[in-house]
Amino acid sequence: IPVSRPCGPMPAICCSKPISGGFTITTMTRGRMSGWSWLSAPGWRNICNERSLSPSVRNWFRLRRAHNISDITFYEVLREIDLKEESLR
């Protein structure tokens, strides 16, 4: 069973490390969002530490806080950013 813990300054977001080695992002309010796992993106290993995320991801976290963006939109864009950054590596 993966262990979830609150992520940095955003208590509504948790991160868990599945046995498979990737990360699944979950929210406290909606429970597990099993569709959101990144299995081969090194940048996500430290998602509990917001400062270690890439500038574009950090910026998206800030925008979400500022504009009250919905969870679904937030994760959809997060996934797009991640796929883009993964393809640049």
Swiss-Prot record:
Tree of life domain: Bacteria
Name of the featured protein: Uncharacterized protein in nac 5'region
Record lineage: Bacteria, Pseudomonadati, Pseudomonadota, Gammaproteobacteria, Enterobacterales
